Amino acid sequence: MHLLDVTMLHGPAVGGVSRYLSTKRRWMRDNTRVQHSQLVAAARAGRGEDGEYLLPGLRIPLCGPLRWPIDPMRWVDTIRRLRPDVIEANDVGSAAWFALAAAHKLDIPLLGFAHVDLVRFARERKGMLAERVVIGYMRAFYNRCDVVIAPSQYMRTRLAGWGIDRVVVRHLGVDATQFHPRSRSTNLRARLGLAESTRLLIYVGRFSAEKRIGVLLDSLQALGPRHHLLLVGAGDTPPLPSNVTRMPFVANTGVLARLIASADALVHAGDVETFGLVYLEAMACGRPVVAAAGGAASEIVDANCGVLARPGSPAALAEAIEALYARDIDALGANARARVEAHFTLDLSMHRLLALYRTAVAAPQASVPALVAT
């Protein structure tokens, strides 16, 4: 079987979608005989690593490394030459429509993976009219896919509310061998110039509006010097309180795992996460999670491995952090690790995805929607 992933969300600093794709590519290479290719928009045409094909795209202002795919004929012709058995579109940009056209020409299934809640972003940034436009756009694309993959029940419910059907849930997974409690280091506080008694929290991710960085920083300011936050990622931030240290984006998985495992807990104020892979990375490292009770957080973080806070409230987030420290953090971390091992390993996630791909390829085109029942 030849699987082709198509996306404009390319580059290590882009976020969870890019990490999902690079992790999947490595897993397929190391654990299966599946031929896995990836077609992405980049600065120029060429070949990347491990079956990665690059086609030119226009730079999107204020969007970092993201590029908007252009030249539809070139995209469609490239896909036809690659001759995949199944295509997965990982965003709803122009490349997704090029993939749809190619899938029709090749008479193969197209799966759309709804990683991002664009509708909520549109409403928060541009208002209700933009929300309606984006709903119509997403419905137009996803209802042309044979199957739509949602990373959580939360996202499945959102998609259904927009009139998108044929949706199946496939949770993401974390490499629990790379993200592991053994990565813990005892000298992180010393490196940050902190006393051993300091309560050390970590945030990992983009510094963007939907991550509610302002709520997070305000909660740390309210908690005061007894608590310290290590903020790891890329983007612009408001002025930082004195008990917050910023660190640039970390591409090396081993270094990132060591940072996470060496903190007391992960804290995240974002309330629109369609999954929240970083929750799993922390839990796999044996660290509990404090998260906003919005999006898919409650599907991952339960009372045995963390604390959920009322969304959008610095005071509520600060209270949740205090509540975490009133409990046995190491016991919560052990529970978190056990939960990952039982439900959210990379192997489990990839095997479930692989079964979906194989069924889609084997099924007659007309019966592919029956996959939703799997």
Please tell me what each predicted stretch does.
Residues 249, 302-303, 307-314, 321-328:
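Conserved acidic donor-binding segment of nucleotide-sugar-dependent glycosyltransferases
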Residues 1-45, 50, 54, 221, ...:
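N-terminal subdomain of nucleotide-sugar transferases
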Residues 288-292:
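Short hydrophobic beta-strand element within catalytic cores of glycosyltransferases
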Residues 4, 194-211, 217-221:
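Conserved donor-binding/catalytic core segment of Leloir-type glycosyltransferases
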